[in-house]
């Protein structure tokens, strides 16, 4: 299921001093509720996480278009729910670390190399050749370190509220539409 936010919403965002107008927020909430009903999940549910991806789209391919953000909705509690739901703690924490990295890079404009360096350092310390050679505890450590990078660069903790994450990602899409390549 997909939910589309049209270019008119972007125009409204810029006409409202780079704030998403209440009317658009209500439309987002309504579309989320409809998607929740279809999927049988609730956005922000910590035990049965409903994760979304956010990407910019255009009718034609555009160079420099922002990267997709996957696993939006994960946080320190939802990751535990995902681990329990999938019976795979490593998968859950790997998904969370990927989300933190994508969100930090694409939405918050923190240099992705900072995250890659941390992952490479941990792999080297563990004698791991590939990310897949790291276990669940290693992924938890990567998440901890990634959140520290976020804190050091943004002066605040990584956002734990899925709705806050979603709105920030939507604003990043709007910013990407206003970027000259």
Give, region by region, the residue ranges found by the protein language model.
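N-terminal beta-alpha lobe that positions the nucleotide/phosphoryl donor
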Residues: 2, 6-181
